[in-house]
Curated annotation (Swiss-Prot):
A Pfam family: Glutaredoxin
Gene behind the chain: GRXS9
Database matches in CDD domains: GRX_GRXh_1_2_like
Native organism: Arabidopsis thaliana
Family assignment from sequence similarity: Belongs to the glutaredoxin family. CC-type subfamily.
Binding site for [2Fe-2S] cluster: 21
Protein name as it appears in the record: Monothiol glutaredoxin-S9
Length: 102
């Protein structure tokens, strides 16, 4: 679990994904559209994939991927991110991590 905690705190927005997961891709595109460049860890390419999945579940993820962290804090999966976005709460949450687009 230490590895997951370390990885989730590396950058402002971190997504744990699998290369074949279309929902992970959709979340990545959403963040990019908001001017955020998330760090994406494709866990299916990691030899410790099973351990990472178990650690994500222990941290409270309802599904192992996508698991989205903002500022080192677990936000959740696609449903939680989309709910935050639709309610207008996602942009203020990621504002500190938006790229300078000037």
């Amino acid at each position: 679990m230490d590895k997951v905690v370390r990885m989730s705190s590396e950058k402002g927005v971190v997504i744990f994904s699998k290369s074949s997961c279309c929902m992970s891709y959709a979340v990545q595109v959403l963040f990019q559209d908001l001017g955020v460049h998330p760090t994406v860890h494709e866990i299916d390419k990691d030899p410790e994939c099973r351990e990472i999945e178990k650690a994500l579940m222990r941290l409270g993820c309802s599904t192992p991927v996508p698991a989205i962290f903002v500022g080192g804090k677990l936000i959740g999966s696609t449903n939680e991110v989309m709910s935050l976005h639709l309610s207008g709460s996602l942009v203020p949450l990621v504002k500190p991590f938006q790229a300078n687009l000037c």
